[in-house]
Swiss-Prot record:
Keywords assigned: Amino-acid biosynthesis, Arginine biosynthesis, ATP-binding, Cytoplasm, Kinase, Nucleotide-binding, Transferase
Source organism: Bacteroides fragilis (strain ATCC 25285 / DSM 2151 / CCUG 4856 / JCM 11019 / LMG 10263 / NCTC 9343 / Onslow / VPI 2553 / EN-2)
Record keyword Transmembrane present: no
Protein name (record): Acetylglutamate kinase
UniProt-annotated location(s): Cytoplasm
The keyword Transferase appears for this protein: yes
GO cellular component terms, semicolon-separated: cytoplasm
Pathway: Amino-acid biosynthesis; L-arginine biosynthesis; N(2)-acetyl-L-ornithine from L-glutamate: step 2/4
InterPro entries reported in the protein's UniProt record: AceGlu_kinase-like_sf, AcgluKinase_fam, ArgB, Asp/Glu/Uridylate_kinase
Catalytic activity line of the entry: N-acetyl-L-glutamate + ATP = N-acetyl-L-glutamyl 5-phosphate + ADP
Highest taxon above the source species: Bacteria
Broad class of the protein's primary localization: cytoplasm
Length: 261
């Protein structure tokens, strides 16, 4: 008996300036609305959180580019990610005829996490994803709903947890790959993974894991791109069909960097 072909699903992750500046957000929403078939949008919003925290007199503490989420900061990121940024995106998509539904991990228990254990650094109320309810998401998607997921999860004990948006996108794509033929696209402000960070045209068109390790050793790939690529390889190895890292405005092109096993 021939195996039934899976329906296609696109998971798009956006963050940074893209979701926080009106012009780039509007362009993104136009491009996202034009994606055919099933889709999910995962967003960040760290710069907005830093800005609002400063206005409230709360210092933002960072270690190795990662936010320390103390009790006061958790209130801010819950307001900003789950409220301001998420609902702006949902409203913008509804205006474009996309039946978007804003979700945090706590909503309908869609993503449960465990508070990150203290090792060298205490990151505070930060969650490491334990499970994604792919059945719930699939049911919503098959009803024509487009989930818009904020970078917040919960621990099942009444506590919200700040959670990396790249990780949420990767874990969501992995969970849904059992049901759909999933393409995961990480959008950011560069055209892809660059050989030379000062040359926007030096895009590496595709990269496998051995090349990734070599580029790290050579210092070509460093900083925040390392965890982004680690998430990408985990997704590919877990059954996601395709992972692309690209410019937000290029999601309808063949540009960017494609991740291979």
């Amino acid at each position: 008996m021939k195996e039934k072909m899976k329906e296609k699903l696109t998971v798009i992750k956006v963050g940074g300036k893209i979701v926080e500046e009106e012009a780039t957000l509007n362009q993104l929403l136009n491009d996202f609305a034009a994606i055919e078939g099933h889709k999910v949008l995962v967003h960040g919003g760290g710069r907005s959180a830093t800005k609002i925290a400063a206005q409230l007199g709360i210092d933002s503490k960072m270690v190795n580019g990662r936010r320390i989420t103390d009790a006061e900061t958790l209130k801010v990121v819950t307001m900003v990610y789950g409220g301001l940024v998420n609902k702006n995106i949902v409203a913008g998509l509804q205006a474009r005829g996309v039946n978007a539904l804003g979700l945090t991990g706590a909503d309908m228990n869609v993503i449960r996490s465990m508070k990150r254990p203290v090792k060298e650094v205490d990151y505070g109320f930060v969650g490491d994803v334990e499970r994604v309810d792919s059945t719930l998401l699939s049911d919503l998607i098959h009803k024509g709903v487009v989930p818009v997921m904020a970078p917040l999860t919960h621990d099942g004990q009444g506590n919200m947890l700040n959670t990396n948006a790249d990780t949420i996108a990767g874990e969501t794509a992995k969970a849904l790959s059992a049901i759909f033929d999933v393409t995961l696209v990480y959008c950011f402000e560069k055209k892809g993974v660059l050989r030379d960070e000062n040359d926007d045209e030096s895009v590496i068109p595709q990269i496998n894991h051995a090349e990734f390790q070599r580029y790290i050793a050579e210092g070509v790939i460093q900083g925040g791109m390392i965890p982004k690529l680690e998430n990408s390889f985990e997704a590919i190895n877990a059954g996601v069909s395709e992972v692309v890292i690209t410019l937000a405005s290029a999601i309808h092109t063949d540009g960017g960097t494609r991740i291979k096993k």
